[in-house]
Amino acid sequence: MNHPTRLPLDFTEAAARKFKELIANEHNSNKKLRVYVEGGGCNGFKYMFTLDDKVNEGDLAINKQGVSLVVDPLSLGYLIGGIVDYVESIEYSRFIVKNLNAKTTCGCGSSFSV
């Protein structure tokens, strides 16, 4: 019986669509969406997103809808089992991480503790 392989980190169709829109504005289809974790925020760690031109040695690259999400090995340790999404509301529009490893998150969802 074949079971689909679960990725250590995934991203939603909404995140892929928004990222496609961002790289179209950059006029550079080689850009990747990099998600990483750094110290800070009100809970000790915060999620960061940037457009990147390269995949570094050891990075995990996940492709969907013709775009790539990349994450470094250290950050991946905090993000395993997570899902990167893009949400829009009256208050904000942003990429978020649904992180199964987070013990607590701040009200805005951009920082967490483990």
UniProtKB/Swiss-Prot annotation:
Transmembrane segments: none
Top-level division of the source organism's lineage: Bacteria
GO (cellular component) term, any one: cytosol
GO molecular function, one term: 4 iron, 4 sulfur cluster binding
Cofactor note: Binds 1 iron-sulfur cluster per subunit.
Needed co-factor(s): iron-sulfur cluster
One of the GO BP terms on file: iron-sulfur cluster assembly
Key words of the record: Iron, Iron-sulfur, Metal-binding
Binding-site positions, iron-sulfur cluster: 42, 106, 108
InterPro entries given in the database record: FeS_biogenesis, FeS_cluster_insertion, FeS_cluster_insertion_RrpA, HesB-like_dom_sf
Pfam family, one: Fe-S_biosyn
Family affiliation: Belongs to the HesB/IscA family.
Quaternary organization: Homodimer.
PANTHER family, alphabetized: IRON-SULFUR CLUSTER ASSEMBLY 2 HOMOLOG, MITOCHONDRIAL (PTHR43011:SF1)
Function comment: Required for insertion of 4Fe-4S clusters for at least IspG.
Family annotation (NCBIfam families): iron-sulfur cluster assembly accessory protein, PRK13623.1
Protein name: Iron-sulfur cluster insertion protein ErpA
